[in-house]
Amino acid sequence: MPTINQLVRKGRTPKVKKTKAPALNGSPMRRGVCTRVYTTTPKKPNSALRKVARVRLNGGVEVTAYIPGVGHNLQEHSIVLVRGGRVKDLPGVRYKIVRGALDTQGVKNRKQARSRYGAKMEKK
């Protein structure tokens, strides 16, 4: 417990909140260029080939971003929009690529949660 004199001299410092997506620099989303598109395997109890991409963001920072949904059209030099959001079973993947924005196409034949995957309403 500090004395009043100590509080007058130093004051209380507010706690600094650490950001979960530092490469975005406080922006909700950032544009970038794919430098490598590949698959990785998840952590222990799970088994799959998860689609990820190395993306060089506008600020020059390179991050690993997850490509959500079934199938994608991304390759090297594709321009993508990256948002925050980690993938729990892929260590080091703290960003996701926005489907249906810039060079990324939306998921085909998607019926539910379409807006998350950039899928248009199906014509009757």
Curated annotation (Swiss-Prot):
InterPro entries: NA-bd_OB-fold, Ribosomal_uS12, Ribosomal_uS12_bac. One of its GO terms (molecular function) is rRNA binding. Pfam families: Ribosom_S12_S23. The keyword Nuclease does not apply. Signal peptide: none annotated. Keywords: Methylation, Ribonucleoprotein, Ribosomal protein, RNA-binding, rRNA-binding, tRNA-binding. Belongs to the universal ribosomal protein uS12 family. Part of the 30S ribosomal subunit. Contacts proteins S8 and S17. May interact with IF1 in the 30S initiation complex. PANTHER family: 30S RIBOSOMAL PROTEIN S12 FAMILY MEMBER. This is Small ribosomal subunit protein uS12.
